[in-house]
C-alpha cells in the first residue's frame, strides 16, 4: 500500500522500488517509530486536532503492532518502503481511516530524525554501560598487579620499567575519555525534531515542547531546516565509536603480541581463543585479532556518512537514507567488541615471571644512570653520552649495566660510586618514579583512587 501516490500517473518500477526501499535495515527502528507516533497523537488530541477517542484507538492499535513485531508476527513489506510507512500501513489495516490521521502535521523527514535520535540515545546509553564495565575490570586487574614489574615500551623497544597496574590504567583513562565522548554526543542528540515537518513546519497548532517532554528530550531543535537535515549526532556517535574501537584495537594488538611465545606475557583463556584446522598445537588469539580487524569497518562507517553528508544542500535529501546501515553496523560491532574484550580480559592470565625477566634485560635503567650523573652536576647531554657509551660497552659483551664492574663504570665517569648498583636495581628505579601519574606503586595507588572516583 503506497501512502504518497496521489500525484503520480505511473507505478514505481520494480527495480526502483527494491532499490528505494529501506525496510530491510530500518525495521530496527520500529520501537522508536511507534514511541514517536504515540507521543505525536497524544499531542494532536491535546491540541484538539484529533479527538480523544481517535487518539485512544490509534494508541491501542500501535501498542498491538509493537507487541506483534516483538513476537515475530509481522512480515514487513518492501512495497511500503520503510519502517514508517510499514507501521502506518499496519495501523490503517487495523483501524481503517482513523489510522490515516497518525501522520497529521508530520513528515517522514522529522519522523526519521526523531527515530534515529531516540536510537542513538538508547544505544549510546547501553555502550556507556559496557565501557564502564570494561573500566571496572581494568581497575580490578590493576589492584592485583601494583607490584608486577614489566617493561614499558617505545617503538616496541624496551624503554623503562613500569608496573602492569600502570599499563592497565593507561587504557582505563583512554576508555574514560571514550565514555565522556558518548555522554557529550548524547547531549547534542537530546533534541526533538518533531514539528519541523518536511522542512518548514506546519500551519497546524502543534505543541513541540509537549512532545519533546513526552519522549524524554531535553528540548526541541531550534530551526526546522536544521532539524530535518542534521546528522551531526550520528557523525559524533560514529566518531566516538571509532575512537573507542581504536583503543580496543591498540590493546588487542598488545594482547596478540603478549600472547606469542616471543613475549609469553599472557595466556588467553580457551573460551576466547581458537585452534587451527591443520596445526594441532595452535591456540590463536582470535578474539583480539577480530576486534583489531573490525576497527577498520567502524572507521569505514564514519567515513561513509561523512562523505555522504559533505555535498548535501538544505534540507532533507534521500542520500540520508544511507546513514542507517553504517549506524546499525557500528552499534553491533562496538557492543560485540566491548563484550568480548571485557570477557577475554576477565579470564586472561598474566605471566608475572616473564614480565619481570623482560624488565631486567634491555637497559631499562639507563635513564636512571644518566639522571644519577645529572644529580652530581654533569650536564644532561654529557650524562646521556656517557650512559650511551656504557650501554654500548655492556651490549658488546653481552651484559647489563649492573653487570659492569665499578672500575669499568668509573672509566667513563669518576663520579660513579658504589651506590649506583643499589640505585639501578629495577625495583628502586621503579619506586623513584612517584610523580603524579607515574608508575611507582605509591603513585599508582593514588591513580587507582582517582579511577574509582571517575566511575562513581
Curated annotation (Swiss-Prot):
Pathway: Amino-acid biosynthesis; L-arginine biosynthesis; L-arginine from L-ornithine and carbamoyl phosphate: step 3/3. GO terms for cellular component: cytosol. The keyword Ribonucleoprotein does not apply. GO terms for molecular function: argininosuccinate lyase activity. GO terms for biological process: arginine biosynthetic process via ornithine; L-arginine biosynthetic process. It comes from the Bacteria. It is an enzyme of class 4 (lyase). This is Argininosuccinate lyase. It catalyses: 2-(N(omega)-L-arginino)succinate = fumarate + L-arginine. It is found in: Cytoplasm. Belongs to the lyase 1 family. Argininosuccinate lyase subfamily. Its EC number is 4.3.2.1. Keywords: Amino-acid biosynthesis, Arginine biosynthesis, Cytoplasm, Lyase. Its main location: cytoplasm. The lineage of its organism: Bacteria, Bacillati, Bacillota, Clostridia, Thermoanaerobacterales.
Amino acid at each position: 500500500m503506497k501512502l504518497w501516490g496521489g500525484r503520480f500517473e505511473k507505478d514505481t518500477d520494480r527495480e526502483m522500488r527494491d532499490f528505494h526501499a529501506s525496510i530491510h535495515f530500518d525495521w530496527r527502528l520500529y520501537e522508536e517509530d511507534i514511541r514517536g507516533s504515540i507521543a505525536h497523537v497524544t499531542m494532536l488530541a491535546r491540541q484538539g486536532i484529533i479527538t480523544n477517542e481517535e487518539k485512544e484507538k490509534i494508541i491501542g492499535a500501535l501498542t498491538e503492532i509493537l507487541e506483534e513485531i516483538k513476537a515475530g508476527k509481522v512480515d514487513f513489506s518492501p512495497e511500503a518502503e520503510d519502517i514508517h510507512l510499514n507501521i502506518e500501513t499496519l495501523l490503517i489495516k487495523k483501524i481503517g481511516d482513523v489510522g490515516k490521521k497518525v501522520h497529521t502535521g508530520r513528515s517522514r523527514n522529522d519522523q526519521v530524525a526523531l527515530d534515529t535520535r531516540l536510537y542513538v540515545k538508547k544505544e549510546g546509553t547501553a555502550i556507556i554501560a559496557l565501557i564502564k564495565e570494561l573500566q571496572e575490570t581494568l581497575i580490578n586487574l590493576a589492584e592485583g598487579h601494583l607490584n608486577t614489574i614489566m617493561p614499558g615500551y617505545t617503538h616496541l623497544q624496551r624503554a623503562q620499567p613500569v608496573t602492569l597496574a600502570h599499563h592497565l590504567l593507561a587504557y582505563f583513562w583512554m576508555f574514560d575519555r571514550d565514555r565522556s565522548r558518548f555522554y557529550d554526543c548524547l547531549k547534542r542528540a537530546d533534541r526533538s525534531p518533531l514539528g519541523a515537518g518536511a522542512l518548514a513546519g506546519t500551519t497546524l497548532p502543534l505543541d513541540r515542547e509537549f512532545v519533546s517532554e513526552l519522549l524524554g528530550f531535553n528540548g526541541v531543535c531550534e530551526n526546522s531546516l536544521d532539524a530535518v537535515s542534521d546528522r551531526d549526532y550520528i557523525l559524533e556517535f560514529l566518531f566516538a565509536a571509532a575512537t573507542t574501537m581504536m583503543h580496543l584495537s591498540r590493546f588487542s594488538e598488545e594482547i596478540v603480541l603478549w600472547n606469542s611465545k616471543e613475549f609469553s606475557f599472557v595466556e588467553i583463556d580457551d573460551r576466547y581463543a581458537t585452534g587451527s584446522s591443520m596445526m594441532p598445537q595452535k591456540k590463536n588469539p582470535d578474539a583480539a585479532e577480530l576486534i583489531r580487524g573490525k576497527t577498520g569497518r567502524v572507521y569505514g562507517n564514519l567515513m561513509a556518512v561523512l562523505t555522504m553528508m559533505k555535498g548535501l544542500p538544505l534540507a532533507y535529501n534521500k542520500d540520508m537514507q544511507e546513514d542507517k546501515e553504517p549506524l546499525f553496523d557500528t552499534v553491533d560491532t562496538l557492543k560485540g567488541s566491548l563484550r568480548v574484550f571485557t570477557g577475554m580480559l576477565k579470564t586472561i592470565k598474566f605471566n608475572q615471571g616473564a614480565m619481570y625477566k623482560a624488565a631486567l634485560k634491555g637497559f631499562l635503567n639507563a635513564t636512571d644512570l644518566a639522571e644519577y650523573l645529572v644529580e652530581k652536576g654533569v650536564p644532561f647531554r654529557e650524562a646521556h653520552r656517557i650512559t650511551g657509551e656504557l650501554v654500548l660497552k655492556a651490549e658488546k659483551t653481552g651484559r647489563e649495566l649492573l653487570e659492569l664492574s665499578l672500575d669499568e663504570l668509573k672509566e667513563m665517569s669518576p663520579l660513579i660510586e658504589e651506590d649506583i648498583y643499589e640505585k639501578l636495581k629495577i625495583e628502586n628505579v621503579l619506586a623513584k618514579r612517584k610523580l603524579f601519574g607515574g608508575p611507582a606503586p605509591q603513585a599508582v595507588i593514588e591513580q587507582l583512587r582517582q579511577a574509582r572516583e571517575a566511575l562513581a
